[in-house]
From Swiss-Prot:
Matches recorded under PROSITE patterns: ACETATE_KINASE_1 (PS01075), ACETATE_KINASE_2 (PS01076)
Name recorded for this polypeptide: Acetate kinase
GO BP, one annotated term: acetate metabolic process
Active site: 146
Cofactor remark from the record: Mg(2+). Can also accept Mn(2+).
Main subcellular localisation: cytoplasm
Family: Belongs to the acetokinase family.
InterPro entries assigned to the protein according to its UniProt record, in alphabetical order: Ac/propionate_kinase, Aliphatic_acid_kin_short-chain, Aliphatic_acid_kinase_CS, ATPase_NBD
Enzyme's top EC category: transferase
Free-text function comment from the UniProt entry: Catalyzes the formation of acetyl phosphate from acetate and ATP. Can also catalyze the reverse reaction.
Organism of origin: Bacillus velezensis (strain DSM 23117 / BGSC 10A6 / LMG 26770 / FZB42)
Residues that coordinate or bind substrate: 89
Matches recorded under Pfam families: Acetate_kinase
Cofactor: Mg(2+); Mn(2+)
Amino acid sequence: MSKIIAINAGSSSLKFQLFEMPSEKVLTKGLVERIGIADSVFTISVNGEKNTEVTDIPDHAVAVKMLLHKLTEFGIIKDLNEIDGIGHRVVHGGEKFSDSVLLTDETIREIEEISELAPLHNPANIVGIKAFKEVLPNVPAVAVFDTAFHQTMPEQSYLYSLPYEYYEKYGIRKYGFHGTSHKYVTQRAAELLGRPLEDLRLISCHLGNGASIAAVEGGKSIDTSMGFTPLAGVAMGTRSGNIDPALIPYIMEKTDQTADEVLNTLNKKSGLLGVSGFSSDLRDIVEASKEGNERAETALEVFASRIHKYIGSYAARMSGVDAIIFTAGIGENSVEVRERVLRGLEFMGVYWDPALNNVRGEEAFISYPHSPVKVMIIPTDEEVMIARDVVRLAQ
């Protein structure tokens, strides 16, 4: 039995989950919020009960020390020697990392070198890595990359039709994200279908505030909707998804915004929020749509129709599909979005049952037994994938 902690460090937050392996039993999980901001919040679940403390946590190193202290204080572990490995989520692995990697001074330096590819995420991930290294220097640590799963994409999928030297000199290409989630749900789908992953053509729809679709053939990602950054692809909570690139100088000219300001609009003021005009939360938009709000209805249709189009194109790309998977906050819980996405896919062998679709947050088949293409809901578990990779690489 080993104890593995999975970490997801954001710029002002730290999510954690402690596993007993190989049983994959969750011993505790929690979240530190508002790190470096007044009134930081530390939340930990003990025996299913949430314990919350509001205090000042000036940086990630203090957050890590507090977390480890709480694990012993609540008797979850006797002492720090019980922690056998640490797994860190890292958003961007560039082309360098096509798999998770054991963290050494050299690999940490290499992750720092590709941070310009994910300036909003990687620096925070590295802060988390260094904070744990300081407190637990002798415990093996592993980085698990969001991009790694998509490194199997062929050139025709990842290259942009730009001057080739941009790819050679600057690494400009599609990388894709949510890889750990897409990998988990496609592996789980094969188990639930009782078929070898190598034989399956799967379309995975990770729909949360950020959303991406992946075409997975024989267990390998062959295409995905996000691109060089997580801004590309389908419309999202606050992100635009794909737009005509010529719009950027046009918007700059019309609104007197700088390029950075337009980019901020595309990242934080677009998507469901931009179209609806009032919320990035899908639940609010579904409610407003039911009450007759036309912009809310349009936002829902824009969101669903973009996903619908990716499913069609990826089915064509793989010459068919065996199963469509819905996962993440919206994919697992929104009956309405699944219904809108699936509507009209009967031509490709998708027959789903509205009664079976009336389910939230649990594993389920929502297609009829006779449907040639299965439709599944699989709650994602990125943390358990991180823990598995720590066991695989560190022990």
